[in-house]
Amino acid sequence: MQICLMDETGATDGALSVLAARWGLEHDEDNPMALVLTPQHLELRKRDEPKLGGIFVDFVGGAMAHRRKFGGGRGEAVAKAVGIKGDYLPDVVDATAGLGRDAFVLASVGCRVRMLERNPVVAALLDDGLTRGYADADIGPWLQQRLQLIHASSLTALTDITPRPQVVYLDPMFPHRQKSALVKKEMRVFQSLVGPDLDADGLLEPARQLATKRVVVKRPDYAPPLADVATPNAIVTKGHRFDIYAGTPLTE
């Protein structure tokens, strides 16, 4: 994949070349998207809209730390949707990891989560965030146990992941109507990079075959159900729906 690669660390250790080789990235000087190694983190920028700033994954500070400390925890809609109850903390595959926010919420309340991400740039951002998270004295010990990244296409990976998870979580990219600054900024940068998930409808059936308990699909409230498969089971929040489908139980 081609993208503009930039190193702002001032170091001469070749870290950017190593990163490019690992994720299969080729430097393209004229690409409007840039992956930038800063002294603090790896970030994605839209070069023709510099005011949008950089997007990076941060599990340790910022909004994620606030959500972990002061958010609803088990009361969050995503936690309810995957079925967390009492001692039951399902094993989850997040097949559309993105920036890892929902996966992190589930991990922070005790679930083991395997994140799938097919876009190499997004996977590199996630990996960078995980590396910093794993090294953090506060969250590192449990984050290493509960949150993992698999760089693979969900369409193929969903058929051969073992062991099978109890829950598969899907949050395909869907054009956002909201005008909130954060969503607008992130979506503009993100959609410039990856575009909409045109093949997302193809994820529902393999997800249902893989999950032993349920599949949860996050949708904007105005979006049709994934693959036009309606379900009476949903958790509705302001602006979103978590549609719930039955999985395929383990056979003895």
UniProtKB/Swiss-Prot annotation:
Domain of life: Bacteria
GO molecular function, one term: rRNA (guanine-N2-)-methyltransferase activity
Disulphide bridges, residue numbers: none
Pfam families the UniProt entry points to: SAM_MT (PF04445)
EC number: 2.1.1.242
Keyword S-adenosyl-L-methionine included in the entry's annotation: yes
Keyword tags: Cytoplasm, Methyltransferase, rRNA processing, S-adenosyl-L-methionine, Transferase
Family note: Belongs to the methyltransferase superfamily. RsmJ family.
NCBIfam families in UniProt: PRK10742.1 (NF008012)
Function, in words: Specifically methylates the guanosine in position 1516 of 16S rRNA.
Protein name as catalogued: Ribosomal RNA small subunit methyltransferase J
